[in-house]
């Protein structure tokens, strides 16, 4: 297992878990982010957080529930999260056309592969709660770090 990085690009699931106290991984994600010297978010991950926070969801009985937050509340939560010491806004500055496709196996991997590509370009680890992203990682490049 790689050592804990001092700087990382956060996948949207780490942002969600860090912000929502009722998330099953909240404590681990929050602790990880607070332990970093710098944490990066992108337009893609910020938009993913806003989309998650403002969409209807289903409870354990599959009943439709209203969104967790209003649009304004979600934007305020994101603003609060990104106002923390150590936050760096990382532009999406790598074209999808420059990505290697060696490890990709399906259409659902585009975003994950892009975030790994962006992290590599900037010498960052990518923090995620999803171990499936490890399948896209290239051992010759900066390691994917998972919050578990």
Which ranges hold each PLM region?
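Acidic, glycine-rich loop-and-strand cores that form catalytic or ligand-binding grooves
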Residues: 76-80
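Short loop/helix-cap segments at secondary-structure boundaries that form the rim of catalytic
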Residues: 133-140
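A basic- and aromatic-enriched beta-loop-alpha substructure that forms the phosphate/nucleotide-
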Residues: 54-57, 83
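Short, electropositive alpha-helical surface patch
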Residues: 107, 141-148
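Active-site neighborhoods of divalent-metal-dependent phosphate/nucleic-acid chemistry enzymes
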Residues: 2-3, 83-131
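Short, well-structured N-terminal submotif of metal-dependent ribonuclease cores
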Residues: 1-41, 56-73
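Amphipathic alpha-helical repeat scaffolds of TPR domains
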Residues: 47-50
């Amino acid at each position: 297992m790689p050592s804990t990085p001092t700087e990382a690009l956060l996948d949207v699931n780490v942002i969600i878990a860090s912000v929502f106290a009722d998330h099953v991984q909240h404590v681990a994600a929050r602790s990880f982010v607070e332990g970093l010297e710098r944490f990066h978010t992108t337009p893609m991950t910020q938009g993913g957080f806003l989309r998650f926070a403002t969409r209807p969801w289903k409870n354990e009985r599959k009943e439709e529930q209203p969104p967790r937050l209003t649009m304004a509340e979600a934007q305020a939560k994101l603003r609060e999260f990104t106002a923390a010491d150590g936050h760096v806004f990382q532009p999406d500055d790598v074209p999808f056309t420059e990505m290697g496709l060696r490890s990709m196996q399906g259409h659902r991997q585009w975003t994950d592969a892009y975030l790994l590509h962006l992290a590599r370009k900037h010498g960052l680890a990518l923090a995620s709660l999803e171990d499936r992203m490890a399948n896209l990682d290239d051992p010759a490049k900066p390691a994917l770090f998972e919050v578990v």
